[in-house]
């Protein structure tokens, strides 16, 4: 007898940019009585993260093809066929009503397996440039969503699903109302940190013409090095952490953010309402630069391409930002936010469930 509750299988893995938006959609549907299961790989972050959110996960064996040697490329078709077969077994055993692909290597075999099994596939592309897996799957998906314009020519722009505590932060006008004293600068390079931020910021910040308070996420294994870099440049009170567990608290604290422009970061700072200086990672397809572009265009952020980043240039940029301008940037960021992406994607999934 078929289970009375609707079931969603989420395919996402590899990075937080794929996994966290998938979790946001999953939680939305769980609140409406849906059962959720996950398809991932055993050696990536989803293996630990997803079960912590109370969601069972199945694994398939699959790796990316970029940068592989000739022998591995020759073997790749057999690996992909094996991964599709594994995914089909998991799908047959659990019988989801809909499959949601959020990106990562696992989505390719999982999406094909769902299509072969007659299960409708919904895709969400987090970046302004579509990943290779989603480019392929878009041809067989029932619905395709994109966070930013341009990833697909005809897909609906819904933003990225962002964690609820970020979306619920008070408006920038309320947060900034009583702030005086040093400008609060939050530096984030992602969970792995960003070497160029870890080296440039400690050198640039002592040269500013105004006081500043610093919270710097250095990334795994870099905390002591970055702390020492600040001390070497005369700043003894910088708060340096490997990770920021409560990112909503950090956004609420900050007057300005200096960071990479990964898709989820761009969506989060917009939802939070924080002005930003983006230093995009140098992808050959300029993915991160294109992610940030819409916030730059609406006056919510400035962007310095990594190849153009210098200590003096960063000093000049930061010196040019006063509290009034920071508030304007924060308000523009909030105005540009799409904070119901999880609901929009969830509604599409519900419409496809038989």
UniProtKB/Swiss-Prot annotation:
Location relative to the cell: Cell inner membrane
Membrane topology: Peripheral membrane protein
Predominant subcellular localization, coarse grouping: membrane
Enzyme Commission (EC) number: 2.4.1.227
EC top class named in words: transferase
Superkingdom of this protein's organism: Bacteria
Residues reported in the UniProt entry to bind UDP-N-acetyl-alpha-D-glucosamine: 15-17, 127, 163, 191, 244, 263-268, 288
InterPro entries according to UniProt: GlcNAc_MurG (IPR006009), Glyco_trans_28_C (IPR007235), GlycoTrans_28_N (IPR004276)
Catalytic reactions of this protein: di-trans,octa-cis-undecaprenyl diphospho-N-acetyl-alpha-D-muramoyl-L-alanyl-D-glutamyl-meso-2,6-diaminopimeloyl-D-alanyl-D-alanine + UDP-N-acetyl-alpha-D-glucosamine = di-trans,octa-cis-undecaprenyl diphospho-[N-acetyl-alpha-D-glucosaminyl-(1->4)]-N-acetyl-alpha-D-muramoyl-L-alanyl-D-glutamyl-meso-2,6-diaminopimeloyl-D-alanyl-D-alanine + UDP + H(+)
GO molecular function list: UDP-N-acetyl-D-glucosamine:N-acetylmuramoyl-L-alanyl-D-glutamyl-meso-2,6-diaminopimelyl-D-alanyl-D-alanine-diphosphoundecaprenol 4-beta-N-acetylglucosaminlytransferase activity; undecaprenyldiphospho-muramoylpentapeptide beta-N-acetylglucosaminyltransferase activity
Residues spanning the signal sequence: none
Gene Ontology CC terms, in alphabetical order: plasma membrane
UniProt keyword Cytoplasm, yes or no: no
UniProt-listed Pfam families: Glyco_tran_28_C, Glyco_transf_28
Gene Ontology BP terms: carbohydrate metabolic process; cell division; cell wall organization; lipid glycosylation; peptidoglycan biosynthetic process; regulation of cell shape
Keywords annotated in UniProt: Cell cycle, Cell division, Cell inner membrane, Cell membrane, Cell shape, Cell wall biogenesis/degradation, Glycosyltransferase, Membrane, Peptidoglycan synthesis, Transferase
Pathway membership: Cell wall biogenesis; peptidoglycan biosynthesis
Family membership noted in the UniProt record: Belongs to the glycosyltransferase 28 family. MurG subfamily.
HAMAP family: MurG (MF_00033)
UniProt function note: Cell wall formation. Catalyzes the transfer of a GlcNAc subunit on undecaprenyl-pyrophosphoryl-MurNAc-pentapeptide (lipid intermediate I) to form undecaprenyl-pyrophosphoryl-MurNAc-(pentapeptide)GlcNAc (lipid intermediate II).
Protein name per its UniProtKB record: UDP-N-acetylglucosamine--N-acetylmuramyl-(pentapeptide) pyrophosphoryl-undecaprenol N-acetylglucosamine transferase
Gene: murG
